Amino acid sequence: MLMMSMSRDDKLPRSVPKGTLPRIWRFAAAHHRMLYGFLALTTVSAVIAVGVPVLAGRVVDAIVNRTGLSTVIWIAAAIAGLAVADALLGLAERWMSSRIGEGLIYDLRRAVFGHVQAMPVAFFTRTRTGSLVSRLNNDVIGAQRAFTSTLSGLVTNVIQLVLTVAVMITLAWQITLLALVLLPIFILPARRMGRTIAALQRESANLNAAMTGQMTERFSAGGATLVKLFGRPQAEAEEFGDRADRVRAIGVRTAMANRVFMTSLTLVSALAQAMVYGVGGWLAFTGRIEAGTVVSLALLLTRLYGPLTQLANARVDVMSALVSFERVFEVLDLKPSLTERPDATPLPATPLGVRLRDVHFTYPDASTISLASLEEVATLEHTENHEVLHGVDLEVAPGQMLALVGPSGAGKSTIASLVPRLYDVDSGAVEVGRDGAWTDIRDTSFADLRGAIGVVTQDGHLFHDTIAGNLRYAKPEATDAELVTALRRARLGALLADLPDGLRTVVGERGYRLSGGERQRLTIARLLLAAPRVVILDEATAHLDSESEVAVQEALTEALVGRTAIVIAHRLSTIRSADTIAVVEDGRVVEQGSHDVLLARAGRYADLHHTQFAGAA
């Protein structure tokens, strides 16, 4: 029902938004010179298209009036020359339009991809991947057509139409006026049918985008597994089939609308030609015009109604292209909520500590970070977000470990996400450095900050690539020997030895060909290659069996040597050795201290410790 309501409401705009066309022209600035050349070629081509019927009429006159064979031969040669010139111009036009179109696709894709990469994590937590991919592919290609077929067609048809009418009036103004009488019968239905076809095309595009989103989610390893585990293949197939059936029905309606449209136009054009032959023949018999003029007018009439047909339907093409541009510009107009300062301060090449000073934080509202069309909802919700961190003060010195414990939803992962600046605080500050030399993370560059901080989550992400490819994501220049060393340090040496393809083994999407423990250790090996000075472990051993947990814990111990660490853990046994343990509840730090100190204090940590180990007993 939601998709149906979206399809009905998401119609083509009735008018062009102000500033869209100038913005498109500015975006194509790199292609302006080639565009001017392209327009010049189309103008010459239009002149040739009008010239051939005139020459054909002169051939008829030369034959009827018996002015000489040489005249006929010269005119025929001129027609042949124009045909060759038109063919060569057509090749040149095609080459230039392809260069412009493909260049525009390249520019748009680079711009959208780069812009999306700069968006904060909050954007990706809300956006449906398939919809975003559709913007990068389908809409970019739709925008490209505006500078190839649509633009060239408009220019060629307008020039050809003007020249054709001018030449026809010169040849026989009476017949030209009669031919133009049929224009209202021609144009009005064309505009009406054009709107119908445009609406059908847009609805089809929306349904195709929805199917792309469904396939993207269901064909991932995790999505496919979930579908099978819940016995939903049939339901998914029916949902997909329903959308595909609607696309099929729309396709049939569009094809029939196009056919009715073209049949009507062909009929009107045929009636006009019959009128030209009838009236023109009568005028020729009475000696008012030459027989060749009648032939020229009849041929020119095809040059008149052909462009009119395309121009009558041009609104559909233009509006479709503008819709594509608008959908691309929608993404480009989303402002990244996290930006770098132009005068970013470089971080010192020394061990780094982390400090949070009176940090308050609220997750951003959906309307500030996303688009309803990218989430495939009718409208974004406008709920009042509540503050999730309230005056948090924490500090971990260089080389020490800070552990965050507390119930689920207390704010531990939120604190961890603020350190690499995946979000910005509302007030207060997150700083890195050491006593006497602290730097607000908003004052340094993303590359500098994230090069100094490594993160291992409970569900480390791996790309559909080889083991080597995933590891080199952290250090592209790493040698095979360095990769092997990192794998051994992450306790994956035995696995590597057992794999026939070794480093060239493909891990599958999200690493699904590996076990949970192997995936975690591979992400740890990747972190070891990056060699960060600060390591954040967000429940890195959660959901692992005992044997895998032991192996991962050994790998983590290796990874933390000589590094500052912020560790989030539900299993208190894994953080006994932490220099500082902070208990987080309801977005506040309610206790801090070492394991022994907090137990002796008999506060919230002692309660958590007693509950966990009493339950284990």
Language model: regions and residue ranges:
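Membrane-integrated ABC transporters
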Residues: 1-49, 64, 68-75, 93-97, ...
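Juxtamembrane loop-to-helix connectors within ABC transporter transmembrane domains
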Residues: 19-20, 28-31, 38, 93, ...
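Helix-loop-helix
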Residues: 63-74, 167-181, 257-326, 331-332
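ABC-type nucleotide-binding domain
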Residues: 348-617
